């Protein structure tokens, strides 16, 4: 029998494939009937098992144009529901949804029907068991443990930013009159402020001889190489995410060395927190994340992993937000002028700057600053696309039937991808000028009822704990920039929209090249 199968493989294989497809179609129809679902209204197929579409996703990342391909090259239709296959999971379909009710169901009302899938496995070499990698009870425990930390740090965080801003300002003044990449400086600024917030001591990546400031000669925990190693490790995580089932192929020596150095650095501060006496912990001046967290848990790996999870979010999202913000301010002089007027009325400008009045509460009172940050996050969300994996056979409320108003089936193990970027640029929610960068829209009644059409910090139970942290940091830096400099200018020729680089978060592929005065 075996010999016959081998001999006639060219007959057996197509037959097995056909039988599998027939059974799958029957099983799908049966599930649709049980769950009251209808066929997907709009589908995108490449007629070659999803390989072509999957290759587009991978190649688009190489060209650093992932966001543009998703918005322009894929069909934007009324219900924005299509099915495409992602390499290498060629047997799993991925439904891409763009309807508020579907996103709400995915992230909130049907939260328990979906999980993060392989994220824990993909990210574990760097991030371990943390709030951004865990599902289920592990995630619930992490969130309960971390939530208080982001309620207590708000006021203290503002005052701790000024020393880092002074270093940032020195770099900018050094380049005054010439063009330079401020995005690179923002990434250094945010890693400095984030490590001080987390560990009580900054990596001081902004300190260098070009501004007459030097790091300590003693570097026994890898402080000098920490930021670069953390960046490189994240690049590998992004690749592991893209290749999914073949993640184990992305595990070379450079990746392992970066993880080792990052862990060594973090373990040093974890151990220092564990060695501190209760009296020493209470006497600490200012807020330190690790010193507060060690009061709740004594597990070294827990402390390290949670710290790195928070660092990933707190550093990269803030740097990206600031970079896109300055890009738009330099591209739109009238917006920069309005922002400076708002800052002047609240905190003064130049020599009349009242830095001591910049607080968590006073930043919230800056109406135009708030509108500007909202618009920046709308047009440039930190995580433009995300996905969830169905943990059981279920449905989403919209996208099926001839009119798109019927539920659609999502089978267990299937990936549901939702595009924050395309939702944020949808004229249905933001009007005919949705593609235009216009902060004033946030003072209009139409933006008060957006709900699930505006998700810069995700939504539902997994909504970002540190959103106020990010907004406060970005607001503080923009206020201080407005107080310190009169003009911002982009290096010509200006490419718009700018090319985006999407790894785990989004930034500008070519940097933010500006001139200040």
Swiss-Prot record:
Regulation: induction: By various alkanes.
Record PROSITE patterns: CYTOCHROME_P450
Any GO MF annotation of the entry: heme binding
Enzymatic class: oxidoreductase
Keywords assigned by UniProt, alphabetized: Heme, Iron, Metal-binding, Monooxygenase, Oxidoreductase
Pfam families xref list: p450
EC nos: 1.14.14.-
Positions contributing to heme binding: 464
Gene3D superfamilies the UniProt entry points to: Cytochrome P450 (1.10.630.10)
Keyword Oxidoreductase listed: yes
Cofactors required: heme
Record CDD domains: CYP52 (cd11063)
Top-rank lineage group of the source organism: Eukaryota
InterPro entries given in the database record: Cyt_P450 (IPR001128), Cyt_P450_CS (IPR017972), Cyt_P450_E_CYP52_ascomycetes (IPR002974), Cyt_P450_E_CYP52_fungi (IPR047146), Cyt_P450_E_grp-II (IPR002402), Cyt_P450_sf (IPR036396)
Family to which this protein belongs: Belongs to the cytochrome P450 family.
Matching PANTHER family: P450, PUTATIVE (EUROFUNG)-RELATED
Biological role: Together with an NADPH cytochrome P450 the enzyme system catalyzes the terminal hydroxylation as the first step in the assimilation of alkanes and fatty acids. Preferentially hydroxylates lauric acid.
The protein, known as: Cytochrome P450 52A8
Organism in which the protein naturally occurs: Candida tropicalis
């Amino acid at each position: 029998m075996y010999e016959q199968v081998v001999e006639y493989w060219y007959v057996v294989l197509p037959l097995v494939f056909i039988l599998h497809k027939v059974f799958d179609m029957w099983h799908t129809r049966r599930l649709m009937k049980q769950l009251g679902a209808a066929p997907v209204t709009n589908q995108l197929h490449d007629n070659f098992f999803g390989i072509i579409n999957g290759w587009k996703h991978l190649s688009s990342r190489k060209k650093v144009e992932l966001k543009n391909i998703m918005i322009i090259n894929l069909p934007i239709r009324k219900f924005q529901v299509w099915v495409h296959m992602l390499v290498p999971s060629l047997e799993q379909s991925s439904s891409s949804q763009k309807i508020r009710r579907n996103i709400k169901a995915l992230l909130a009302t049907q939260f328990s029907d979906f999980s993060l899938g392989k994220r824990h496995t993909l990210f574990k070499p760097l991030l371990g068991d943390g709030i951004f990698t865990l599902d289920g009870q592990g995630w619930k425990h992490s969130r309960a443990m971390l939530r208080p930390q982001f309620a207590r740090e708000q006021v203290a965080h503002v005052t701790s930013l000024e020393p880092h801003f002074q270093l940032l300002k020195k770099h900018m003044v050094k380049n005054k009159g010439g063009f330079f990449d401020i995005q690179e400086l923002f990434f250094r600024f945010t890693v400095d402020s984030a490590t001080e917030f987390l560990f009580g001591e900054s990596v001081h990546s902004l300190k260098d001889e070009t501004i007459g400031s030097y790091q300590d000669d003693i570097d026994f925990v890898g402080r000098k190489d920490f930021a670069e190693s953390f960046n490189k490790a994240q690049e590998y995580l992004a690749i592991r995410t893209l290749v999914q089932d073949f993640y184990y192929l992305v595990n070379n020596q450079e990746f392992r060395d970066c993880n080792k150095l990052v862990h060594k650095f973090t373990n040093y501060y974890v151990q220092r927190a564990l060695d501190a006496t209760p009296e020493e912990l209470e006497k600490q001046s200012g807020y330190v994340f690790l010193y507060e967290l060690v009061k709740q848990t004594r597990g070294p790996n827990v402390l390290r992993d949670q710290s790195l999870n928070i660092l990933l979010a707190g550093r990269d999202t803030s740097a990206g937000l600031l970079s896109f913000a300055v890009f738009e301010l330099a591209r739109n002089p009238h917006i920069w002028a309005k922002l400076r007027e708002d800052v002047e009325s609240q905190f003064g400008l130049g020599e009349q700057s009242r830095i001591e009045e910049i607080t968590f509460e006073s930043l919230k009172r800056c109406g135009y600053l708030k509108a500007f940050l909202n618009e920046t996050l709308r047009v440039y969300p930190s995580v433009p696309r995300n996905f969830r994996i169905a943990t059981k056979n279920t449905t989403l409320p919209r996208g099926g039937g001839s009119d798109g108003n019927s539920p659609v089936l999502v089978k267990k193990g299937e990936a549901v991808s939702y595009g924050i970027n395309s939702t944020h640029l949808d004229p249905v929610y933001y009007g005919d000028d949705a593609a235009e960068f216009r902060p004033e829209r946030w003072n209009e009644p139409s933006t008060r009822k957006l709900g699930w059409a505006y998700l810069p910090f995700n939504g539902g139970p997994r909504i970002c704990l540190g959103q106020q942290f990010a907004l406060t940091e970005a607001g503080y830096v923009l206020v201080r920039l407005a107080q310190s400099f009169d003009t911002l200018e982009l290096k010509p020729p200006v490419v718009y929209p700018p090319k985006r680089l999407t790894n785990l978060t989004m930034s500008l592929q070519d940097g933010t090249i500006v001139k200040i005065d």
